[in-house]
Amino acid sequence: MKTVTEFQNKNILVLGIAKSGYAAATLLQKLGANVIVNDGKPLAENVLAAELQAKGMDVVCGGHPLELLERNISLVVKNPGIPYSNPILVAAKEKQIPIVTEVELAYRISEAPFVGITGSNGKTTTTMLTFEMLKEGQKHPVIAGNIGTVACEVAQDAKENEVVVTELSSFQLMGVELFQPKIAAFLNLFEAHLDYHGTKKEYGLAKANIFKNQTENDYSVINADDADVMALSAYSKGQKILFSTTKEIEDGACIKDNALYFKGEKVVEVSDIVLPGQHNLENILAAMSIAKLLGTSNEAITVVLKRFTGVKHRLEYVTTINNRKFYNDSKATNMLATEKALSAFTQPIVLLAGGLDRGNEFDDLIPYFKNVKAIVTFGQTAPKLVRAAEKAGLDIIESVDTLDEAVVKAYAHSKDGDVVLLSPACASWDQFKTFEERGDIFIQAVHKLI
């Protein structure tokens, strides 16, 4: 860890505890700051807050009183999920108090360079692929962020010869000031999180913060097939490395003659790749680009692609029952992810979909329903998905209250050779704590059919 003195004896407000807030508060105390921790949940229900209080921190729970800002606050470190419309953040901004997220702290203390990966979809798969390729190539990667350990915990132990690989959301990237990844990858962009950002434009600009501090000594890995990403890459001063699944890229990554190429050199045959789905070729090209920029051999990349079958809850194969294959794609929390999942199969599909209503309609899914023989909907968006399915002319459309019921109905509508696919196209928070919980419940329900 770098020697950092900028936080010594400063009053710093950590807003929202959870994993990242707990780690940030603990780190800041270690760096000599006077830490004030604030969380909306009452102290009696907040185990992490009680632990921080026991460490001698000033803990205020049960709301976000504006009076906290009267304590000569030098910096606010916010939980990524707390919107900037929260009154305490609005007031902090008016007082010109800097507001950052935990990844900014991680960068400031890390001896190791960062690889940052963002995009609307594919972040986790690309991050895991990158980590595995670098590990196989003996480039000493450590993984941080939404996967595994919180970034500022990882950064404390990261050495100069290592590289921190981290998945970055728009929520996290809104709170960066000095963060400068050696390699920044921007995978794709489409309309999402409008309840947080307001517009697609603001959402895209938040993502583009990944380029904010890059220089000509850094690299920006950019999806040449996504017009929005290409436009936002104008914010990067780094060396641009493009990747494409549709056209040849001489100075980047592409697919040619059934093989993946990087800067004109064949790296791996498509036939060696075991990860299913056309959309995953984009993720692989991005990860391969990062790995090659860091000196990973073609052999190491090939070894990984021959064994990497995917990430849990992302087109995860569950089991086969009476020649029906079941797949868990609970991470499909938006339409684009579900579109890509539906495009991954040629067999007839029984689709399970539904979840939190964020205000959007689902007509964009209609062109992807060509292999869908039946849909079972659940959650807040069930009526909207039913309308889209009716417009698509599906013969079998059913709505149920719970995911357990949906699994039973989906199996009843399936036949020999079909795929039964959970790909909700919605966030999980109407009925579940996380998309992981939703996926686990789906898997449990499937195994009950056996």
UniProtKB/Swiss-Prot annotation:
A Pfam family annotated for this UniProt entry: Mur_ligase_M
EC number(s) from the headed UniProt entry: 6.3.2.9
Principal location listed in the UniProt entry: cytoplasm
Keywords: ATP-binding, Cell cycle, Cell division, Cell shape, Cell wall biogenesis/degradation, Cytoplasm, Ligase, Nucleotide-binding, Peptidoglycan synthesis
Keyword ATP-binding: yes
Family annotation (InterPro entries): Mur-like_cat_sf (IPR036565), Mur_ligase_C (IPR004101), Mur_ligase_C_dom_sf (IPR036615), Mur_ligase_cen (IPR013221), MurD (IPR005762)
Superkingdom as given in the UniProt entry: Bacteria
Residues annotated for ATP binding in this entry: G119, S120, N121, G122, K123, T124, T125
Catalytic activity: UDP-N-acetyl-alpha-D-muramoyl-L-alanine + D-glutamate + ATP = UDP-N-acetyl-alpha-D-muramoyl-L-alanyl-D-glutamate + ADP + phosphate + H(+)
BP GO annotations: cell division; cell wall organization; peptidoglycan biosynthetic process; regulation of cell shape
Matching Gene3D superfamilies: Mur ligase, C-terminal domain, Mur-like, catalytic domain, NAD(P)-binding Rossmann-like Domain
Location in the cell: Cytoplasm
Keyword Cell cycle: yes
UniProt pathway annotation: Cell wall biogenesis; peptidoglycan biosynthesis
Similarity annotation: Belongs to the MurCDEF family.
Function: Cell wall formation. Catalyzes the addition of glutamate to the nucleotide precursor UDP-N-acetylmuramoyl-L-alanine (UMA).
PANTHER family assigned to the protein according to its UniProt record, in alphabetical order: UDP-N-ACETYLMURAMOYLALANINE--D-GLUTAMATE LIGASE
Protein known as: UDP-N-acetylmuramoylalanine--D-glutamate ligase
Lineage of producing organism: Bacteria, Bacillati, Bacillota, Bacilli, Bacillales
